[in-house]
Amino acid sequence: YCSYTMEA
């Protein structure tokens, strides 16, 4: 996932 702007 991307934990900075898009989570999942």
UniProtKB/Swiss-Prot annotation:
Highest taxon above the source species: Eukaryota
Residue ranges crossing the lipid bilayer per the database entry: none
Expression across tissues: Found in the liquid endosperm contained in green fruit of coconut palms, also known as coconut water (at protein level).
UniProtKB keywords: Antimicrobial, Plant defense, Secreted
GO cellular component: extracellular space
Cell compartments where the protein resides: Secreted, Extracellular space
GO BP field: defense response to Gram-negative bacterium; defense response to Gram-positive bacterium
Function: Has antimicrobial activity against Gram-positive bacteria B.subtilis (MIC=257 ug/ml) and S.aureus (MIC=274 ug/ml), and against Gram-negative bacteria E.coli (MIC=302 ug/ml) and P.aeruginosa (MIC=259 ug/ml).
Subunit note: Monomer.
This protein's name: Antimicrobial peptide 3
